């Protein structure tokens, strides 16, 4: 396997050819915050939390979609980057109604965990709280609460790339973006949903939840994505 050398925060390291900066950083013991990225799904660079500084680059680069190159000099936790990440989290908090005390994902929310990690306990921006559709609990097993959505599209990618149903999609832009089911159908009336639950498991917040879960009862498992994708690539199952 071909290997490249690069410098991360002043320390020389190495990584396989073709990996992203995010993968290279993690392989060298440097963790970067992410919300939209999830191993097993195609990276899209949407949340902008994994931005890094690369010497010679004219702008900050999203590590999850930038390929690591030989000789790169990368900074991951400068004062500028930390300010950007905190501001990004504050903007996410201001766009929707993120009230942790009444959320089913309280204690298992990736957004809240990152806020705690980076010291974000409020938003300096005006709370927008757009006029959103009501909570959809028409599905037999799952619920959809638009108030918690951060537009990471993990659920959409899991439904499309892993399950192959493409039941979920996103409409609108910015604060007006929201998840839709089968082109504006209720989730319970969907003809394409297989009820597999992959979308609920990959959701980083309380947007998608198991019906019957009360506050702080959500437990999600995302490791299955890497297992499924790896099995398909290796043709471990004859029916795939």
List where the protein language model places each region.
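Extended, non-catalytic structural segments that build the interaction scaffolds
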Residues: 9-11, 144-145
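N-terminal cofactor/phosphate-binding cores enriched in small/glycine residues
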Residues: 12-70
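Internal gly/pro-rich beta-alpha loop/helix module
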Residues: 195
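Eukaryote-biased recognition of intrinsically disordered, low-complexity regulatory segments
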Residues: 1-9
């Amino acid at each position: 396997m071909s290997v490249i050398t690069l410098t991360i925060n002043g320390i020389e390291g190495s990584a396989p050819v073709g990996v992203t900066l995010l993968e290279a950083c993690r392989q060298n013991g440097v963790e970067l915050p992410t919300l939209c990225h999830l191993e097993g799904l195609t990276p899209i660079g949407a949340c902008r939390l994994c931005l890094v500084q690369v010497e010679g680059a004219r702008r900050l680069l999203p590590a999850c979609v930038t390929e690591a190159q030989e000789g790169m000099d990368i900074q991951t936790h400068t004062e500028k980057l930390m300010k950007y990440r905190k501001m990004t989290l504050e903007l996410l908090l201001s766009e929707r109604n993120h009230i942790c005390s009444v959320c089913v994902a309280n204690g298992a929310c990736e957004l809240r965990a990152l806020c705690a990690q980076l010291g974000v306990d409020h938003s300096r921006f005006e709370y927008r709280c757009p006029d959103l559709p009501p909570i959809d609990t028409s599905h037999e097993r799952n619920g959809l609460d638009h108030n918690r959505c951060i537009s990471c599209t993990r659920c959409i990618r899991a439904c499309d790339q892993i399950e192959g149903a493409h039941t979920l999609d996103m409409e609108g832009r910015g604060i007006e973006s929201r998840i839709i089911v089968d082109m504006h159908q209720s989730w319970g009336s969907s003809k394409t949903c297989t009820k597999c639950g992959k979308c609920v498991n990959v959701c980083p917040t309380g947007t998608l939840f198991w019906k019957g879960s009360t506050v702080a009862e959500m437990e999600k498992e995302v490791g299955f994505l890497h297992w499924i994708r790896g099995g398909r690539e290796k043709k471990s199952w004859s029916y795939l």
